[in-house]
Swiss-Prot record:
Belongs to the D-alanine--D-alanine ligase family. It holds the Pfam family Dala_Dala_lig_N. SUPFAM superfamilies: Glutathione synthetase ATP-binding domain-like, PreATP-grasp domain. The lineage of its organism: Bacteria, Bacillati, Bacillota, Bacillota incertae sedis, Caldicellulosiruptorales. The gene is ddl. This is D-alanine--D-alanine ligase.
Length: 364
């Protein structure tokens, strides 16, 4: 049997570079070696593309020591990786690309744009859905137009804030009640997110968020449970059982996710049937609204007192580490990790084949 050549992208110019490496290592260890030839491609924090030549089990933060310069060609007549060694270029055919890039410059439509140009099938959402879901401000505005329930929010741009700081602080304090969350609009793994309980903390939180983006969100804090839902599919959509995150800290921060490791994941989440059904229906509606494909993890809040459901965000390349909710939810729902990867690759190929019927010329 001819093996499919699967290029796995990891790293990236992102605050989630290290998390991406852990996710990609997990993906590559669970890909069926009888079906796939794995081509590990790392992107450094500086944006250099390198073919990783070491062992998958040894992949860590020192991966660049075992690498060769490379890049994916945007030439769709090639559909290949270009390996550069001793000033000579060699083309390596690629059948599918599996981007395991979290955050900016990987999950935001940028890499997806390159892969569209290349014509190579790739796992996950396309350019538009990736960009929309990565930008929490646009995602919330679009969800608002469709009547999807969510907490009160305000979008602030850095240049406007710097010229009118007092105005924005007054506006926030008039529209919201403490505590509030302050988030970079384009960030993941809770990087740059703070919970502010008073004016002093608010000012510090805004400063922190602007370190990671030029656009931030102010969100009303809700006394809520954090519920996550895994979604799989293109036109036919599968929604997983629901999971609950019980943070070890005040909220599910970067430290709570990846450093202290003591946050609890409950699968399935213990919810009333009506609430569970509402979340699953909303997940499908949101998945279709953002034109997602392949996969996404959609996160919600459930008010602890009223059971009211609120949309939080969509992750188009969810974590694939050993502690990540997406593969755990799918496994609980009857799709083991290796089969999940098979399905994602199959969905990528199917989506690419559908595009082959699109005409790009009036001739012929």
């Amino acid at each position: 049997m001819t093996k499919l050549k699967v290029a796995v992208l990891f790293g990236g110019v992102s605050t989630e570079h290290e998390v991406s490496i852990v996710s990609a290592k997990s993906v590559m260890q669970n890909l069926d070696k009888e079906k796939y030839e794995i081509i590990p491609i790392g992107i450094t924090k500086e944006g250099k593309w390198l073919l990783y030549t070491g062992k998958i089990e040894d992949l860590d933060s020192k991966w660049t020591m075992y690498s060769i310069e490379c890049f994916i060609s945007p030439d769709r007549t090639k559909k290949a990786l270009v390996k550069i060694k001793d000033s000579e270029a060699t083309f390596i055919d690629i059948d599918v690309v599996f981007p395991v890039l979290h955050g900016l410059n990987g999950e935001d439509g940028t890499v997806q744009g390159l892969l569209e140009l290349s014509g190579i099938p790739y796992v996950g959402c396309g350019v538009l859905s990736s960009a929309l879901c990565m930008d929490k401000a646009f995602a919330k505005k679009l969800a608002l137009l469709e009547g999807i329930p969510q907490g009160h929010f305000l979008v602030i741009y850095k240049d406007e804030y710097l010229s009118k700081k007092e105005y924005f602080i007054r506006r926030i304090e008039s529209e919201f009640s403490y505590p509030v969350f302050v988030k970079p609009a384009n960030s993941g793994s809770s990087v740059g997110i703070s919970k502010a309980k008073d004016k002093d903390e608010l000012i510090l939180a805004i400063h922190e968020a602007f370190l990671y983006d030029t656009k931030i969100l102010i969100e009303q804090a809700i006394n809520a449970r954090e519920i996550e839902c895994a979604v799989l599919g293109n036109s036919e959509i599968l929604v997983s059982a629901l999971g609950e995150i019980v943070p070890s800290r005040e909220f599910y921060s970067y430290e709570a996710k990846y450093i202290d490791g003591s946050s609890e994941l409950i699968i399935p989440a213990k919810l009333e049937k009506q609430v569970e059904d509402e979340i699953k229906e909303l997940a499908v509606k949101i998945y279709k609204l953002f034109e997602c494909s392949g996969m996404a993890r959609i996160d919600f809040f459930v008010d602890k007192e009223t059971n009211k459901v609120y949309f939080n965000e969509v992750n188009t390349i969810p974590g694939f580490t050993s502690i990540s909710m997406y593969p755990k939810l799918m496994e609980y729902s009857g799709i083991p990790y290796p089969q999940l990867l098979d399905k994602l690759i199959q969905l990528a190929i199917e989506k690419n084949q559908q595009k082959q019927s699109i005409k790009y010329s009036k001739e012929g």
